């Protein structure tokens, strides 16, 4: 946020700095996959892999997408992470703003992400049945994305681990017809990609767990518990596109981010990080 608007940071540097931050945790054994550090048009490639030949400077006044994760084994247990955030990189003079189209697409992706996160469904429901929830807001604008909405995640094992998957049942990858069961972990990662210009993806990991619903029919009902707590870039949100319930979800999510991360940041004694967290978790 402070340095990228100067045009002095490139994709490789950003990925290396992220690994440096992640390595502070002594339980880190490896990344869970090659970090997708994608600026501007590269962000429109969902599985872009930066190297010394493709590496570009992150342009001021552009979108930057970062998809990363780690494999952890330590005293606190073992686990695998996978997270994507899409952020707006401003300009040195502070005047660069995302276009109306960027904000529209980002907000529609966010609405899909929220729809999955808030879903309640009966036991036996498949990922293929839930997939439409993530896409319907993009479909209303004649848009879509050509990858799955979610994949299973292991525990210090494969970051893509079956049998479950959330996606179109017509896709080439299996798992969308597998029932979603309590205890499974999935990703929640709708996106949008405009070739040659920018890409958007918002990804959290979610745990399937039982839900108690007053007055519900007999049977077991399930929902998702969020596992990932990193602020979502408010600069790219068109608040007018959100329903009151969606605004409440974003505000609650950011309040949880502030509560969960706040003490950890305080323990580090990093005033700049504390200020960043405070600013990026304010209510909409």
Annotate each language-model stretch with its function.
Residues 1-284:
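Active-site neighborhoods and metal-handling regions in enzymes and metal-associated proteins
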């Amino acid at each position: 946020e402070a340095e990228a608007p100067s045009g002095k940071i490139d994709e490789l540097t950003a990925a290396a700095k992220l690994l440096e931050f992640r390595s502070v945790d002594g339980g880190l054994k490896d990344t869970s996959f090659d970090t997708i550090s994608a600026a501007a048009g590269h962000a429109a490639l969902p599985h872009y892999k930066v190297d010394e030949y493709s590496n570009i400077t992150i342009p001021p006044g552009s979108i930057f997408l970062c998809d990363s994760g780690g494999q952890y084994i330590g005293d606190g247990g073992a686990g695998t992470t996978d997270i994507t955030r899409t952020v707006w990189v401003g300009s040195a003079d502070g005047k660069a703003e995302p276009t109306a189209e960027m904000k529209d697409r980002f907000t529609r992706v966010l609405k899909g992400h929220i729809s999955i996160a808030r879903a309640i469904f009966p036991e036996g429901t498949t990922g293929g049945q839930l997939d439409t929830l993530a896409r319907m807001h993009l479909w209303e604008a004649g848009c879509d994305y050509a990858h799955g909405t979610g994949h299973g995640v292991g525990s210090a094992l494969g970051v893509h681990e079956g049998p479950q998957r959330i996606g179109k049942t017509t896709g080439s990858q299996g798992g969308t017809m597998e029932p979603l069961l309590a205890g499974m972990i999935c990703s929640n990662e709708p996106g949008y990609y405009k070739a040659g210009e920018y890409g958007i993806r918002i990804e959290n990991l979610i745990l399937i767990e039982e839900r108690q619903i007053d007055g519900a029919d007999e049977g077991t009902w399930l929902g998702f518990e969020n596992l990932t707590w990193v602020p979502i870039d408010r600069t790219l949100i068109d608040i007018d596109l959100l329903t009151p319930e969606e605004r409440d979800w974003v505000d609650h999510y950011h309040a949880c981010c502030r509560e969960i991360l706040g003490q950890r940041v305080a323990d580090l004694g990093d005033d700049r990080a504390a200020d960043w967290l405070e600013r990026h978790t304010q209510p909409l």
